[in-house]
């Protein structure tokens, strides 16, 4: 059985359109902040005025008002709410100082969103319509990258398709979130590492560009490049992947270090103080990591598959279990299986990336010296999911999960996702 054709992503597009239409503006995690950050970038504002300062930028007040109208808190949304939101002009009360969180992402994480912001500003588009145009463009950009991933690694394309059709993936793709292009870039880079291309100048440039953009967008996934150290990766592809990652990571980290600020006023959050706490008591921190894994692993898995709204809209447990079983089955029956060295490397990369993400959230989002970790969400692991699944592959599976099975489960799971959103917001 061959892998999945990129044409299966037409299903992903139509399923994502359902979330785009049903999901109210601003009800995807951090969507207002991503929207405002792209608007600030489109106006030439790329970083805070000073290190660790709250990144405020004067944006038209209508860009805040629409999210207040569509807040869906304490009441059910009605057509009247949408009518009011659609009528809001850019500047009903002039400019308003707006916090452009999450400012610690570099502007390269917002290329499609910034393009929409520039176009909408030139056309005089109202904020409400701009939100939906940006969602569509972000979705198409991410799906384009995922299609390239499926073409780059046809033997692992079913794993990529299964990741792309997850309710959580589609919900993120159909939003202004920087996660949308990052997921696309992450899956494309995983594809290059799982099924290395021939070292032609074109493919070397493609691998290097993908590694660089991913590093500058979401540096948490830099360890994926280490798969290039193992055969059958051609030496020049290895150099392209490692060198581009090595260039991008220091830039992204320097930007994040400068632009970070405490987005939790009232809580003592300080990365430098947190790091000193870790160094002073490493065994205590190891216990924090272990407790987080023990207590929250199931929760992260559920969020990976589908947790909507501001993490307050749930899929039925049975649907989460069905998707989980599908992912495991896709991984176990993937072919060809990784050889022993690449399998061990893949497992090490996934484990290290998991703990690296937990560490980053402990440093930048958790209270200093806390006994728990705040801020980790299961969706953060979507870009490396194909590598995790490929590491499960049996040496000689008697059968393989095909794209039709993946598609059927996706239709069922996302239908339940639509129902959950409608019941929560309308």
Task: Report each predicted region and the residues it spans.
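Specific aromatic-rich, kink-prone transmembrane helix
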Residues: 147-148, 183-198, 210, 387-388
């Amino acid at each position: 059985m061959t892998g999945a054709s990129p044409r299966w992503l037409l299903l992903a597009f139509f399923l994502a359109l359902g979330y785009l239409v049903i999901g109210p503006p601003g009800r995807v995690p951090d969507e207002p902040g991503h929207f405002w950050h792209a608007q600030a970038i489109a106006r030439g504002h790329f970083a805070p005025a000073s290190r660790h300062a709250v990144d405020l930028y004067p944006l038209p007040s209508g860009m805040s008002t629409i999210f207040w109208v569509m807040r869906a808190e304490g009441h059910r949304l009605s057509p009247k709410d949408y009518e009011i939101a659609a009528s809001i002009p850019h500047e009903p009360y002039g400019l308003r100082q707006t916090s452009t969180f999450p400012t610690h992402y570099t502007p390269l994480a917002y290329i499609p969103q910034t393009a929409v912001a520039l176009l909408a500003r030139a056309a005089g588009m109202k904020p409400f319509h701009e939100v939906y145009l940006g969602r569509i463009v972000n979705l198409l950009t991410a799906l384009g990258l995922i299609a390239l991933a499926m073409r780059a690694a046809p033997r692992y394309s079913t794993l990529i398709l299964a990741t792309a059709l997850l309710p959580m993936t589609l919900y993120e793709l159909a939003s202004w979130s920087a996660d949308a292009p990052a997921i696309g870039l992450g899956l494309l880079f995983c594809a290059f590492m799982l099924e290395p291309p021939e070292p032609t100048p074109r493919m070397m440039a493609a691998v290097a560009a993908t590694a660089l953009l991913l590093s500058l967008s979401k540096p948490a996934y830099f360890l994926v490049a280490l798969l290039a150290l193992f055969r059958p990766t051609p030496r020049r592809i290895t150099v392209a992947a490692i060198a581009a990652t090595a260039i991008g990571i220091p830039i992204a980290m320097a930007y994040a270090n400068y632009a970070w600020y405490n987005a939790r006023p009232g809580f003592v959050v300080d990365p430098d103080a947190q790091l000193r706490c870790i160094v002073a008591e490493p065994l205590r921190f190891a216990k924090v990591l272990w407790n987080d894994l023990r207590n929250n692993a199931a929760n992260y898995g559920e969020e990976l598959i589908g947790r909507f709204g501001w993490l307050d809209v749930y899929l039925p447990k049975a649907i989460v279990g069905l998707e989980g079983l599908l992912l495991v089955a896709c991984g176990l029956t993937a072919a060809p299986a990784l050889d022993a060295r690449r399998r061990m490397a893949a497992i090490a990369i996934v484990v290290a990336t998991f703990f690296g993400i937990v560490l980053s959230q402990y440093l930048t989002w958790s209270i200093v010296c806390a006994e728990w970790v705040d801020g980790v969400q299961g969706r953060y692991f979507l870009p490396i999911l194909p590598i995790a699944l490929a590491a499960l592959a049996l040496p000689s599976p008697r059968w393989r999960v095909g794209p039709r099975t993946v598609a059927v489960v996706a239709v069922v799971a996302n239908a339940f996702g639509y129902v959950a959103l409608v019941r929560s917001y309308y």
